[in-house]
C-alpha cells in the first residue's frame, strides 16, 4: 500500500471534523487580479494600449490648433476677397499647409486608435481566456457544501455575464476613459495656450457641464433600474402563469390572470414614463447649456478679438478645444461604472477561483492501497447539512457491510438514506462518528482513488453529449472497445445500442439522439461496470422507470452487484427483498434491521407497515406483497415523447446559458446587433410571421397618435437646430472677418441667436422626448397586454407547438415588446432629428455653395461604404465565430450542471482539458475580430480630419477659380459637418428599426392567432350539469401528431356519483381522456357527452365551472394560500375556504402558520412540501363544489406517509360527485365503482376490482407486475 500524508484540511481526531476558515471569505476583489500569472506580453499590451490611448486622446484637441490657423487664413482671405485684393499665393500656401496638417493628424489618430484598441482587445482576450480556464477548474474541484450554497445558473451566469463585465472593464472602456482624461487635459491646456482669458470663461461652465452629465447619468440609471425591476416582476408573473396554463384553463382563471398582469404592467408603465421624462430632461438640459455657453464664449471671444488680445481664429479654436475636452471627459466618465462593474465581477469570479474547499477532491494526498476487500463500517455517524444546521439528518447511525454483501436502505423521504451514500462518496464530511473502509477511516484514503473504486448508479443518470462509447469510457478512459461491449451486455444495453444509427458511435444526450429513461439507466450501469468497482451504490436506480424498463434495468443491476459490496436505496420494496440485510431508517436512526422475512414478520414494525401501505389486495389470496412505487411517467400531454417537460425546460435553460457563453467567448463588444437581428429574423420565420412595416406599427399606435403628432412637430423644430446653428456660426465668421469697431455689438446680437437656439432646441427636445417616450411606453404596455390576453385565450394545442414553449412566449413579452417600442419612443425623435438635420444641412450647403456641397457628401458616402464593408465582413464571420464556440460553451454548462457526476467519475481534469482544447479556436477568432473592430473604430475617429483636409483643399480649388468665396467654403463645410454629426447619431438606431419591424411582425401575428376552442365561453349552452359522462367511439390524435392515434374508438361512461378508474400502461390514453373531458382538445371522431349534451355544444367556461382537476404535480401560483384555494372564483367567503381546507386535511397546518391563509406559497408553491401543495390543490377543487372531479395520479409523486394523508382527503372529496381517477398505484383504486382497463387507445376491460381479477386479463397481469 502506498502511503502519503493524510489530507491536512481534515482533523479526524475523535471522528469529528473541523474545517479551517476559508481566507477567501474576506476577499474584496482587486482590479489587478486579472493580471495574475500574466506574462511580459500581457504587460506590454496593457501599457502599450494605455499609452497609445492617452496619446490618441491628447491629439484630438490639436484639431483646434489647426482650425485656428485655417480659420484665420479663411477670415483674412474673406476680408481680402471683399476688398478685391486677395493674395492667392499666400492664401493657397496657408490652406495647403493646414490641410496637410489635418491629413497628418488623421494618420496619427488612425494609427494610435488602431494600435491602442488592438492592444487592449488582444490583452482582454488573453486574460479572459486564462480566467475562463481557472474558473472552470476551480468550480469542478469544489465540494458539495459549496454547491449547496450557490446555484448552477449563477455559476454559468458568472462565466458569461461576469466575464462580459470584466471584458468591459479591462478592454476598450479603459482606453476610452484614459483617452477622455487625456483629451480634457490637452484641450484645456491648448485653450490656455491660445487665450487664457477666454479659456477661464469657458472653464466656469465646465463644472456645470460635467455636473449635468453626472446627475443625468445618476437619475437615469436609477429610473432604468426601477423600470427593469417592475418589468421583471411582470415577466416573472407571466412566466409562472404560462408555465401553468392548463391549470389556468381548468379553473377559468384567464380573466383573473389578465387583470393581474395588467396591474403589474401599469406599475412598469408608470416607471417607464418617468424614465422617458428623465431621459428627455437629460438630453435637453446639456443642449441648452451648450448653446448658452456658445453665446457667452463667442461674444466674449469676439470682444477680445476686436481688442487685439486674440486672433479671430482662436475664438473658434479655444471654444472647441475646451468643449471637446469637456465632452470627451463627460462621455468617458460613465465608463467608470464599467470599471466598477468589472471590479465587482472580478470579486465574484476570483472568489470562486480562490475558494479552497474543505474536501479537496483533486488532492493527490492520502493512502492508495493496492487491493481492498470492500468491508464498510458506519460507526456513530451524525450529520447535518451546512445549509440547514438546525435539522440533524443522521443521529448516530451504525452498521456494517461485509465484502460481497448487498445491504438495502429503506425509509421515508428525508430519513438519511441518500445522505449516507453522499458521506461514503465524501461529498460531505460527517459531523461525528467514523466511516471506515476495510477498517481505515475513509478520510485517510486518497479521495480520487476512493471515488474511483466506487461505482454509483442514481435515480436520474446523467448522460453527456457524446457518443455511446465516449459516455461509457467516462468510467475508465483506458478500456477497450471490447470492454465497452461486454459491459453493455452485462447492463442489458448492447441490444438497443446495436439498433442505433451508428451503434456505439451514435451521439446521444441533449440536442442529439434522445434515449428513454431505461436506456439511459442501462448506459449509466455500463459506465459504472467498466470501472470494475469493488463497491456499488444504487440510489433508487429504478424508481423513475416504468414497469417494463424497470424489469430490464433490475436484471442488469442484479448482474452488476454480483461479487461486489453493494448499498442499495429503494422506495420500491419489491426490488430489495433478496438483499442480505435491510436497514430501516427513521428520523435519522436505524429503527429496524434484518432480512425481508425477519422484518415482515414484525406486524407492528415500520418495514411491515410500509409493505402493507404498498400492497395490493388480491382475490383468492391474502398474501402480503411488496409493491413498487409507480412509474413517474412523462407528464406532458404527449405520452410517446421520450423527454420529460422538466428535462426539456432544463435543456432549454442550458441552451440559453450555452448561447450566452458562446457570445461571451467570441464577442469583443458588448452589443452585437447583427446577431440579434438574425436570430430575431429566424424566430419570425419559425412563427410563420412577416416583417411588419413602420406603417403597421404606427397604425397599431393610433391611440397614442395625438402625442406622436405633437412630438413630431417639436422633433422637426429640433431637427432645424443644428442647420440653424451652422448659419449663425457662419455669421460670426463674417462678423470677425469684416472687423471694425462694432464687432462686439454685432457679436452680442449674434449671440442672442445662440440663446434662441438654446431655448427652442431644449424645449423641443424635452417635449418631443417626453411625449414620444410616453407614447412608446403606453403602446409597448398595450402590445404586451394584447399578446398576453390572446395567449390566455388559446387552447392546449397552441402550447403543444414547440414554438410556443414557456421560454419562447415569455421572451416574446419581455424582448419583442421593447423592440417594437424602439420605433415609437425617443429613438424615433433621434432618427427624425438626424434625418431633418441632414436634409436641412444639405439644403443649407447647396444654398450657399452648390458646387462645394457634393464633395462633402462624397467623402461622407465613402466613409459609409468603408464602414459598411467592415461591418458586413464582421457579420459574415459572426456566425462562424459563434459556431466555433459551441463545443466549449457546451462543455462548460454540461460539466458545471452535472458537477456531482463529474466528481463521482473523477473526470474533473478530463472536462477541463476538453474545454481548454475546445476554447482555443474561439479565442484566436475573437482576437482577429477585435483587430477588425479596431480598424472600424480607427476609421471613424480619423475620418473627420481627412474629411476637413479634402473639403478645404477642394474649397481652395473653387476659390482659386473664382467659383466660390472663403466664407462660402467655411459655411458649407460647417453645415455639412453639423448634418453629418446628427445623422451619425441617428444611424446608430437604424438596426433597432430593423429589429422593431421583425418583432412587430411576430407580435401582430400572435395577436391575430385564433383559438380552435372558445376558451372565453362566449358561445355555447349553459344547462344545469348533473355529472353524467359518456364517451362513445372516440378517436383522437394530438394536433402536432395527426398520424398517431392516442384514442382509437374509446368508450367510457360514468353515472352521477360514481367513481370510475382508468388504468393501463403508459401511453394508452388515460390522461388524454381527462383532457377531452376538460375540453382542452376536441375529439376527431365520436362523441363526448356531459349528461345528454355534446361537450362541443356547451359553453367552455360553464363546463369547466362544473369540473375540478387534481393532477400528479399540482400547479400553485405565487399567491397566498387563500388566493390559491379560491383561484378563478369570485365572492368566496372565508367560511367556504376553511370548510374546503378542512376536508382536504390542510386547515390545521394553515392555521399553524404565522399569517394563516394570507401566507404566500412562493413561486410555484415552492414554500410548501409536495403533500401540502397537493392538499391545497384538493381544497381548490373542493371549494368549487364541482359536479365532476378528475384525479390524474394525484398521489403518485408522494412518499408513503404523504400519500396516506392526501388519499384520505381525496376519499372525502369525491363523495357525492362523479369522479374519474387515473392511477398506476392500483391499491388506490380497488374500491372504485368501475375500473376501465385501457390499451392502445381502447377500453379493453371493464368491471370492479374483484371482477377483473377473476378474468385474469390485462388488469390481472398489471397487478401481477406490481406485486412481483
UniProtKB/Swiss-Prot annotation:
Swiss-Prot/TrEMBL GO biological process terms: defense response to Gram-negative bacterium; innate immune response; response to metal ion; stress response to cadmium ion; transmembrane transport
Catalytic reaction equation(s): ATP + H2O + xenobioticSide 1 = ADP + phosphate + xenobioticSide 2
Entry-linked PANTHER family: ATP-DEPENDENT PERMEASE MDL1, MITOCHONDRIAL, ATP-DEPENDENT TRANSLOCASE ABCB1-LIKE
Domain ABC transmembrane type-1: 46-341, 708-995
Binding site for ATP 1: 411-418
Cytoplasmic side: 1-39, 122-170, 221-278, 337-708, 773-827, 870-931, 991-1268
Keywords for this protein: ATP-binding, Cell membrane, Glycoprotein, Membrane, Nucleotide-binding, Repeat, Translocase, Transmembrane, Transmembrane helix, Transport
Entry function: Mediates ATP-dependent export of organic anions and xenobiotics from the cytoplasm. Hydrolyzes ATP with low efficiency.
Chief place of localization: membrane
Record's bilayer topology term: Multi-pass membrane protein
Protein name per the record: Multidrug resistance protein pgp-3
Superkingdom of origin organism: Eukaryota
Family named by the database record: Belongs to the ABC transporter superfamily. ABCB family. Multidrug resistance exporter (TC 3.A.1.201) subfamily.
Sequence ranges on the Extracellular membrane side: 63-100, 193-199, 301-314, 730-751, 849, 953-968
GO molecular function, one term: ABC-type xenobiotic transporter activity
Transmembrane segments: 40-62, 101-121, 171-192, 200-220, 279-300, 315-336, 709-729, 752-772, 828-848, 850-869, 932-952, 969-990
InterPro entries named in the record: AAA+_ATPase, ABC1_TM_dom, ABC1_TM_sf, ABC_transporter-like_ATP-bd, ABC_transporter-like_CS, P-loop_NTPase, Type_1_exporter
Domain ABC transporter per the UniProt entry, residue ranges: 376-612, 1029-1265
GO CC field: apical plasma membrane; membrane
Compartment(s) where it occurs, according to its Swiss-Prot or TrEMBL record: Cell membrane
Amino acid at each position: 500500500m502506498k502511503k502519503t500524508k493524510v489530507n491536512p484540511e481534515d482533523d479526524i481526531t475523535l471522528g469529528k471534523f473541523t474545517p479551517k476558515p476559508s481566507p477567501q471569505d474576506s476577499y474584496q476583489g482587486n482590479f489587478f487580479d486579472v493580471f495574475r500569472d500574466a506574462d511580459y506580453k500581457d504587460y506590454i499590451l496593457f501599457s502599450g494600449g494605455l499609452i497609445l490611448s492617452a496619446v490618441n486622446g491628447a491629439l484630438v484637441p490639436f484639431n483646434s490648433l489647426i482650425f485656428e490657423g485655417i480659420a484665420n487664413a479663411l477670415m483674412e482671405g474673406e476680408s481680402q476677397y471683399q476688398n478685391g485684393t486677395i493674395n492667392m499665393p499666400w492664401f493657397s500656401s496657408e490652406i495647403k499647409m493646414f490641410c496637410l496638417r489635418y491629413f497628418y493628424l488623421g494618420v496619427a489618430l488612425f494609427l494610435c486608435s488602431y494600435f491602442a484598441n488592438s492592444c487592449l482587445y488582444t490583452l482582454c482576450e488573453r486574460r479572459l481566456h486564462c480566467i475562463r480556464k481557472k474558473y472552470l477548474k476551480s468550480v469542478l474541484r469544489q465540494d458539495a457544501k459549496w454547491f449547496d450554497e450557490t446555484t448552477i445558473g449563477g455559476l454559468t451566469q458568472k462565466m458569461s455575464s461576469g466575464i462580459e463585465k470584466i471584458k468591459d472593464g479591462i478592454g476598450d472602456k479603459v482606453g476610452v476613459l484614459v483617452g477622455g482624461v487625456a483629451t480634457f487635459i490637452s484641450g484645456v491646456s491648448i485653450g490656455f495656450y491660445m487665450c487664457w482669458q477666454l479659456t477661464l470663461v469657458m472653464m466656469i461652465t465646465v463644472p456645470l457641464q460635467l455636473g449635468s452629465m453626472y446627475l443625468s447619468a445618476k437619475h437615469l440609471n436609477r429610473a432604468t433600474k426601477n423600470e427593469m425591476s417592475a418589468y421583471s416582476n411582470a415577466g416573472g408573473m407571466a412566466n409562472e402563469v404560462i408555465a401553468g396554463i392548463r391549470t389556468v384553463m381548468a379553473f377559468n382563471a384567464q380573466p383573473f390572470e389578465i387583470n393581474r398582469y395588467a396591474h403589474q404592467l401599469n406599475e412598469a408603465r408608470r416607471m417607464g414614463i418617468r424614465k422617458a421624462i428623465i431621459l428627455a430632461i437629460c438630453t435637453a438640459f446639456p443642449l441648452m447649456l451648450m448653446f448658452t455657453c456658445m453665446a457667452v464664449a463667442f461674444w466674449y471671444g469676439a470682444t477680445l478679438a476686436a481688442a487685439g488680445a486674440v486672433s479671430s481664429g482662436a475664438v473658434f479654436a479655444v471654444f472647441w478645444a475646451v468643449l471637446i475636452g469637456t465632452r470627451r471627459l463627460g462621455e468617458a466618465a460613465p465608463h467608470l461604472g464599467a470599471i466598477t462593474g468589472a471590479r465587482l465581477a472580478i470579486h465574484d469570479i476570483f472568489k470562486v477561483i480562490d475558494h479552497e474547499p474543505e474536501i479537496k477532491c483533486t488532492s493527490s494526498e492520502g493512502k492508495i492501497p493496492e487491493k481492498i476487500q470492500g468491508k464498510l463500517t458506519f460507526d456513530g455517524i451524525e450529520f447535518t447539512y451546512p445549509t440547514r444546521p438546525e435539522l440533524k439528518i443522521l443521529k448516530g447511525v451504525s452498521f456494517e457491510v461485509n465484502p460481497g454483501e448487498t445491504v438495502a436502505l429503506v425509509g421515508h423521504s428525508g430519513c438519511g438514506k441518500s445522505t449516507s451514500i453522499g458521506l461514503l462518496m465524501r461529498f460531505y464530511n460527517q459531523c461525528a462518528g467514523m466511516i471506515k473502509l476495510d477498517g481505515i477511516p475513509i478520510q485517510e484514503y486518497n479521495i480520487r482513488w476512493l471515488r474511483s473504486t466506487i461505482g454509483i448508479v442514481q435515480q436520474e443518470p446523467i448522460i453527456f453529449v457524446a457518443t455511446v462509447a465516449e459516455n461509457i469510457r467516462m468510467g475508465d478512459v483506458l478500456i477497450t472497445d471490447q470492454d465497452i461491449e461486454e459491459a453493455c451486455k452485462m447492463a442489458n444495453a448492447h441490444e438497443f445500442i446495436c439498433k442505433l444509427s451508428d451503434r456505439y458511435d451514435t451521439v446521444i444526450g441533449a440536442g442529439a439522439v434522445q434515449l428513454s429513461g431505461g436506456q439511459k439507466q442501462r448506459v449509466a450501469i455500463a459506465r459504472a461496470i467498466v470501472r470494475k468497482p469493488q463497491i456499488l451504490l444504487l440510489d433508487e436506480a429504478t424508481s423513475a422507470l416504468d414497469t417494463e424498463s424497470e424489469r430490464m434495468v433490475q436484471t442488469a443491476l442484479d448482474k452488476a452487484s454480483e461479487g461486489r459490496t453493494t448499498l442499495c436505496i429503494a422506495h420500491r420494496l419489491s426490488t430489495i427483498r433478496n438483499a442480505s440485510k435491510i436497514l430501516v431508517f427513521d428520523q435519522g436512526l436505524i429503527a429496524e434491521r434484518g432480512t425481508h422475512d425477519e422484518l415482515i414478520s414484525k406486524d407492528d414494525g415500520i418495514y411491515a407497515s410500509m409493505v402493507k401501505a404498498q400492497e395490493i389486495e388480491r382475490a383468492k389470496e391474502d398474501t402480503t406483497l411488496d409493491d413498487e412505487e409507480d412509474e413517474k411517467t412523462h407528464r406532458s400531454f404527449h405520452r410517446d415523447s421520450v423527454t420529460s417537460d422538466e428535462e426539456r425546460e432544463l435543456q432549454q435553460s442550458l441552451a440559453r446559458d450555452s448561447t450566452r457563453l458562446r457570445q461571451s467567448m467570441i464577442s469583443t463588444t458588448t452589443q452585437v446587433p447583427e446577431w440579434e437581428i438574425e436570430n430575431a429574423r429566424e424566430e419570425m420565420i419559425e412563427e410563420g410571421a412577416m416583417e411588419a412595416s413602420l406603417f403597421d406599427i404606427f397604425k397599431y399606435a393610433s391611440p397614442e397618435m395625438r402625442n406622436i403628432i405633437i412630438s413630431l412637430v417639436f422633433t422637426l423644430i429640433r431637427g432645424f437646430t443644428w442647420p440653424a446653428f451652422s448659419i449663425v456660426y457662419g455669421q460670426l465668421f463674417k462678423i470677425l472677418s469684416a472687423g471694425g469697431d462694432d464687432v462686439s455689438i454685432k457679436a452680442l446680437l449674434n449671440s442672442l441667436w445662440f440663446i434662441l437656439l438654446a431655448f427652442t432646441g431644449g424645449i423641443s427636445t424635452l417635449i418631443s422626448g417626453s411625449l414620444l417616450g410616453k407614447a412608446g411606453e403606453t403602446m409597448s404596455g398595450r402590445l404586451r397586454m394584447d399578446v398576453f390576453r390572446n395567449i390566455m385565450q388559446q387552447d392546449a394545442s397552441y402550447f403543444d407547438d414547440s414554438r410556443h414553449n414557456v421560454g419562447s412566449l415569455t421572451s416574446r413579452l419581455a424582448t419583442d415588446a421593447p423592440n417594437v417600442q424602439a420605433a415609437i419612443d425617443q429613438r424615433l425623435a433621434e432618427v427624425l432629428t438626424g434625418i431633418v438635420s441632414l436634409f436641412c444641412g444639405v439644403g443649407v450647403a447647396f444654398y450657399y455653395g452648390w458646387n462645394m456641397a457634393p464633395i462633402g457628401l462624397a467623402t461622407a458616402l465613402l466613409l459609409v461604404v468603408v464602414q459598411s464593408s467592415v461591418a458586413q465582413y464582421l457579420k459574415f464571420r459572426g456566425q462562424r465565430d459563434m459556431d466555433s464556440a459551441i463545443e466549449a460553451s457546451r462543455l462548460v454548462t454540461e460539466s458545471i450542471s452535472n458537477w456531482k457526476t463529474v466528481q463521482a467519475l473523477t473526470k474533473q481534469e478530463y472536462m477541463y482539458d476538453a474545454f481548454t482544447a475546445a476554447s482555443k479556436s474561439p479565442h484566436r477568432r475573437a482576437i482577429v475580430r477585435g483587430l477588425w473592430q479596431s480598424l472600424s473604430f480607427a476609421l471613424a475617429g480619423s475620418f473627420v480630419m481627412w474629411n476637413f483636409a479634402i473639403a478645404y483643399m477642394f474649397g481652395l480649388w473653387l476659390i482659386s477659380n473664382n467659383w466660390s468665396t472663403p466664407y462660402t467654403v467655411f459655411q458649407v463645410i460647417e453645415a455639412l459637418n453639423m448634418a453629418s454629426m446628427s445623422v451619425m447619431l441617428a444611424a446608430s438606431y437604424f438596426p433597432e428599426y430593423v429589429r422593431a419591424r421583425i418583432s412587430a411582425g411576430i407580435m401582430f401575428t400572435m395577436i391575430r392567432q385564433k383559438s380552435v376552442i372558445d376558451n372565453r365561453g362566449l358561445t355555447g349552452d349553459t344547462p344545469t350539469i348533473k355529472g353524467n359522462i359518456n364517451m362513445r367511439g372516440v378517436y383522437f390524435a394530438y394536433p402536432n401528431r395527426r398520424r398517431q392515434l392516442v384514442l382509437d374508438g374509446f368508450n367510457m361512461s360514468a353515472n352521477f356519483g360514481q367513481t370510475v378508474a382508468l388504468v393501463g400502461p403508459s401511453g394508452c390514453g388515460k390522461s388524454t381522456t381527462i383532457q377531452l373531458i376538460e375540453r382542452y382538445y376536441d375529439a376527431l371522431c365520436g362523441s363526448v357527452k356531459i349528461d345528454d349534451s355534446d361537450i362541443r355544444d356547451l359553453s367552455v367556461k360553464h363546463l369547466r365551472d362544473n369540473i375540478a382537476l387534481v393532477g400528479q404535480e399540482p400547479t400553485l401560483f405565487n399567491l397566498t394560500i387563500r388566493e390559491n384555494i379560491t383561484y378563478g372564483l369570485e365572492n368566496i367567503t372565508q367560511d367556504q375556504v376553511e370548510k374546503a381546507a378542512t376536508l382536504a386535511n390542510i386547515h390545521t397546518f394553515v392555521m399553524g402558520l404565522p399569517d394563516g391563509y394570507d401566507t404566500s406559497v412562493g413561486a410555484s408553491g415552492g414554500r410548501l412540501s409536495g403533500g401540502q401543495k397537493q392538499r391545497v390543490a384538493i381544497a381548490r377543487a373542493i371549494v368549487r363544489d364541482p359536479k365532476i372531479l378528475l384525479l390524474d395520479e394525484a398521489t403518485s409523486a408522494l412518499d408513503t406517509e404523504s400519500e396516506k394523508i392526501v388519499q384520505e382527503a381525496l376519499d372525502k372529496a369525491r363523495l357525492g360527485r362523479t369522479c374519474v381517477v387515473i392511477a398506476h398505484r392500483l391499491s388506490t383504486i380497488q374500491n372504485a365503482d368501475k375500473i376501465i382497463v385501457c390499451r392502445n387507445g381502447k377500453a379493453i376491460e371493464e368491471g370492479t376490482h374483484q371482477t377483473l381479477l377473476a378474468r385474469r386479463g390485462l388488469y390481472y397481469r398489471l397487478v401481477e407486475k406490481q406485486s412481483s
